[in-house]
Amino acid sequence: LTDPIFFKRASPSQLIGPKRRTPPALSIRQLPQIDFIVISHNHYDHLDYHSIRQLLARFPNIVIMVPMGLKRALLKWGAKHVVELDWWDCVTVDGLCFSATPARHWSNRSLFNVNKSLWCGWVVQSNIDNQKQLKTLYFMGDTCYSPELKEIAKRFPSIDLALIPIGAYAPRWYMQSQHIAPKQAVQLYDELNCHCAIAIHWGAFELADEPLDEPAQLLNAYKGNRSFHLIKIGGSQAINRIDSEVE
């Protein structure tokens, strides 16, 4: 799972704050076996206390990957297995290599801990020798556009599937230093040289000024014939590693 949030608000309180506009596709009770969670940073729409607690109750031995500065909090919440990494650090667990990658964002959960923990993306690589299985997955997390992100493509030249955010970008004068917009998402798709991508970070919470469905509309307008897929919440797609076609 990536940055799981199953509750109705992305907020320290379930009484106020950004409210979920689209229900989760599955409840925690309906999930299949989950072995790993990767966390990109500590903002409330990415790191949710109640979701983590309930996931730990169902999957007590789950391994949680976090950027620097978050391990202590996850252990306090009841996690048994937490791995904390700096940018470009990597760890291999059960045949999967997890690498924390740079992002351009920020962190806080109150006025008193701004940028006290790191933010990152994650590259997950499998060493399974199967030509049809995805071998390299890149979860971008939250980031604005930065030319430095090209370094990720240099270090990981064969990204099978990228999870690229497209929402929470308006107004640009304020959000351009925090989140990419759909046009930049397409630019990053090209610069990463990934085989295919799925759009994330849209359609669930109203976090910025754009309408909830605008990110998808703009991505459809910009992406052309690229294998950059939009999946509605509750939908699913099978990705073929060889030709990046949706089956």
Ranges and model annotations:
Residues 1, 35-38, 99, 123, ...:
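Conserved beta-strand elements of the Class I
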Residues 1-42, 51-54, 69, 108-114, ...:
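Pre-active-site segment of Zn-dependent metallo-hydrolases
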Residues 2, 63-64, 80-89, 160-165:
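Short hydrophobic/aromatic-enriched beta-strand-loop microsegments
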Residues 4-6, 42, 103-105, 141-143, ...:
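Active-site metal-binding loops of divalent metal-dependent hydrolases
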Residues 10, 47, 108, 172, ...:
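Glycine/Thr-rich phosphate-binding loops of Rossmann-like dinucleotide-binding domains
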Residues 27-34, 40-48, 73-88, 139-140, ...:
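Conserved N-terminal glycine/acidic-rich loop preference
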Residues 28-31, 36, 51, 63, ...:
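Cap/insert and terminal regions of metallo-dependent hydrolase folds
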Residues 66-135, 218-235, 239-242:
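Metallo-beta-lactamase
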